């Protein structure tokens, strides 16, 4: 029998419908894989009993011919999504053993469509990080290794658990969130596909907030088709989220294999960085040639305010985080450390509950919002954000269908290798991705090649607002040209 954990989500869906195997068998195969891969630390909570119950229910629905689009498909859920009655911590000590009394809109839509919950996935604490090293549960280990090396590598962040679990065959797909690259960067580091949809495409209700004007949920999966299938279930209007946009959800899967003939693909000159590795530059040009061979037209474009995006992002995001994280005080839920009075209790709780990177960003955010610095920093960053958005609008107004860039400035690096003395070194990982969040646009990362040490590298496609379909069509061209990337199993 085929190893059920090696199937794509689309193959598993078809196998379930054709009765080649049952949802319970598919779920059990993934639960066994999770148990054998605990060294990767991808899951922070496993839910085997719940998973089997959901799989049995899916089998019953399939038998009656009433299975939903994801009936029996085992998924992992980033620990930022509220799951009713199931521990949700954002991988922070401050939330302790919090069990939400409600379900996030995105996960409730996945369960509505018949998906199975395997467990909660590791992430950077409150989604603040680019390497999944800030989690209170410890770092996630990338299933990929450098050729001939046993050095443990990061999977990227903040959705490192999601990307590692998908790459290692520990789920058929995973939910993730992206505030400045947290879907696309880990996807690139693990040879998986990750799409950050247009801001407002997926509901943020029930997702622990980092920076509310930047956060967006999306899927990580093994193929472009799988990510399209998942986004179809995750997307949709939600009146409970004031930033949710009321637009019909297209059939994203139908975009796979769609013609890209005549599409204009922008190559932004500002993304050619000084000191960019030759491998990344070569891969970028190779991706452009693949799209050209499929009938697309390449045009050089200019996004002049790109160089200001990273500093502006690291003002806007911490400012919003400092406001959002003020709700964690130990009074109604989560960890509480008592003090002589309520102010001391707040101080003790936050000192013990928040990790170092979260504290750093709260401090930065509070500083840039303070009376003396608001105009100099926060207001100026918002003006830069408007200019970045305008750059993209002008580009798309010239008939450009999508923009092709590298996804990351390097392949995965070693755990503990970056950001120790200088946090900016870590922040630079987001250099190709933050502009997309600042402008509220959709972006997809697709694996496109390997570096000299055999590690996967990804390319990013940036699209017009609510035109994820074009990204899926173009992403499919890259995937068909580059092939799929699967790590050699060393952990079991």
Swiss-Prot record:
HAMAP family tied to this protein: GatA
Quaternary context: Heterotrimer of A, B and C subunits.
UniProt cross-references to SUPFAM superfamilies, sorted A to Z: Amidase signature (AS) enzymes
Membrane-spanning residues: none
Entry's Gene Ontology BP terms: translation
Species for this entry: Rhodopseudomonas palustris (strain HaA2)
Keywords, comma-separated and alphabetical: ATP-binding, Ligase, Nucleotide-binding, Protein biosynthesis
GO molecular-function terms, A-Z: ATP binding; glutaminyl-tRNA synthase (glutamine-hydrolyzing) activity
Gene that this sequence comes from: gatA
Biological role stated in the UniProt entry: Allows the formation of correctly charged Gln-tRNA(Gln) through the transamidation of misacylated Glu-tRNA(Gln) in organisms which lack glutaminyl-tRNA synthetase. The reaction takes place in the presence of glutamine and ATP through an activated gamma-phospho-Glu-tRNA(Gln).
InterPro entries, A to Z: Amidase, Amidase_CS, Amidase_dom, AS_sf, GatA
Cellular compartments per GO CC: glutamyl-tRNA(Gln) amidotransferase complex
Keyword Acetylation included in the entry's annotation: no
Name of this protein: Glutamyl-tRNA(Gln) amidotransferase subunit A
Residue positions of the active site: 78, 158, 182
Substrates-to-products reaction catalysed: L-glutamyl-tRNA(Gln) + L-glutamine + ATP + H2O = L-glutaminyl-tRNA(Gln) + L-glutamate + ADP + phosphate + H(+)
The EC number(s) this enzyme carries: 6.3.5.7
Keyword Protein biosynthesis on entry: yes
Assigned protein family: Belongs to the amidase family. GatA subfamily.
């Amino acid at each position: 029998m085929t190893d059920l954990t090696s199937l794509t989500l689309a193959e598993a869906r078809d196998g379930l419908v054709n009765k080649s195997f049952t949802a319970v068998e598919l779920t059990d195969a993934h639960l066994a894989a999770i148990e054998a891969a605990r060294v990767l630390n991808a899951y922070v909570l496993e839910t085997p009993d719940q998973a089997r119950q959901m799989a049995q229910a899916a089998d019953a629905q399939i038998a009656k011919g009433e299975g939903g689009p994801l009936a029996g498909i085992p998924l992992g859920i980033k620990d930022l999504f509220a799951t009713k009655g199931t521990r949700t911590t954002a991988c922070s000590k401050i939330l302790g053993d919090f069990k939400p009394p409600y379900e996030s809109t995105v996960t409730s839509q996945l369960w509505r469509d018949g998906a199975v919950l395997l467990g909660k996935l590791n992430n950077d604490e409150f989604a603040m990080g680019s390497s999944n090293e800030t989690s209170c549960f410890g770092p996630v280990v990338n299933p990929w290794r450098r050729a001939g090396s046993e050095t443990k590598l990061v999977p990227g962040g903040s959705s490192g658990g999601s990307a590692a679990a998908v790459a290692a065959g520990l789920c058929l797909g995973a939910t993730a969130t992206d505030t400045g690259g947290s879907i696309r960067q880990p996807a690139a580091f693990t040879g998986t596909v990750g799409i950050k949809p247009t801001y407002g495409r997926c509901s943020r209700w029930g997702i622990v907030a980092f920076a509310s004007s930047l956060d967006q949920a999306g899927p990580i999966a093994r193929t472009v088709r799988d990510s399209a299938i998942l986004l179809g279930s995750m997307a949709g209007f939600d009146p409970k989220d004031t930033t949710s946009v009321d637009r019909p959800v297209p059939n994203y899967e139908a975009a796979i294999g769609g013609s890209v003939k005549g599409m204009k693909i922008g190559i932004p000159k500002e993304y050619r960085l000084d000191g960019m590795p030759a491998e990344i530059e070569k891969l970028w040009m190779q991706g452009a040639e693949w799209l050209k061979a499929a009938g697309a037209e390449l045009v050089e474009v200019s996004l002049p305010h790109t160089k200001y995006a990273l500093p502006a992002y690291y003002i806007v995001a911490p400012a919003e985080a400092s406001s959002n994280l003020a709700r964690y005080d130990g009074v109604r839920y989560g960890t509480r450390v008592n003090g002589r009075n309520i102010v001391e209790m707040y101080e003790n709780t936050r000192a013990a509950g928040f990790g170092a990177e979260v504290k750093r960003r709260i401090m930065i955010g509070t500083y840039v919002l303070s009376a003396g610095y608001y105009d100099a920093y926060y207001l100026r960053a918002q003006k830069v954000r408007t200019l970045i958005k305008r750059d993209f609008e002008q580009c798309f107004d010239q008939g450009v269908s999508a923009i092709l860039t590298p996804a990351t400035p390097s392949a995965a690096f070693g755990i503990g290798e970056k950001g120790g003395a200088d946090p900016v070194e870590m922040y630079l990982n987001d250099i190709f991705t933050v502009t997309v969040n600042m402008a509220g646009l959709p972006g997809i990362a697709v694996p496109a090649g390997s570096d000299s040490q055999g590690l996967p590298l990804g390319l990013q496609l940036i699209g017009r607002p609510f035109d994820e379909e074009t990204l899926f069509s173009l992403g499919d061209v890259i995937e068909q040209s580059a092939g799929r990337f699967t790590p050699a199993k060393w952990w079991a």
